[in-house]
Amino acid sequence: MLKPDYGSIKINSKDVSNFPIYKRTLKFKIGFVPQNGGFFQDLTVLENLKAISEITIANVAIREEKINSLISKFELDALLRIKANHLSGGQKKRLVIALSLISDPKVLLLDEPFAALDILTIKNLQKIIVELQSIQGISIILCDHQARDLLACVDTAVIINNGKVVANGTPSEIIDDIDAKRTYFGDSFKII
């Protein structure tokens, strides 16, 4: 999301490298889910949803409809009066994804979405990611060190090591790629 050290950032073939971050995210409908944070810690879940929706949605009726839809979709009903900093890791992740969807992004960037989550929460998050792609048509770009978790919810993956593309393909192609395996297991990796 920052200005690149070298190269360029292109969205729909337009170079946006020098655009301010807010312009890139709003004009090109990009949502962002950071690894940590992404919400107002001292506000309740409902207050977070209202605060972000007031910034991005002018019409009050549409705003309320959007909030109610996200509360239902991310099962936040029982959490509405709880301050965000008191939520579990999985609950925080659901809240941040809901907040990122308020502006109806076409592209959603997720940074380490599976970090520090339990297996059940990871499975639920994978389901959400697949639904966002297949049902809502949102393009998802995510980075994660847990290849197994990532490969379970994407149709294409790219493995990068030291700034260079090591492997690029479907999850099954990545799993079979020797260079991808060496990236994860080191040069001493041997096929038996």
Language model region names:
Residues 36, 43-54:
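Q-loop/switch helix immediately C-terminal to the Walker
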Residues 61-79, 127-130:
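Conserved ABC ATPase "signature" region
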Residues 83-87:
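Conserved ABC ATPase signature
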Residues 108-112:
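Catalytic Walker B motif of ABC-type/P-loop ATPase nucleotide-binding domains
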Residues 7-18, 25-28:
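Conserved ABC transporter NBD signature motif
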Residues 104:
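Conserved catalytic motifs of ABC-family nucleotide-binding domains
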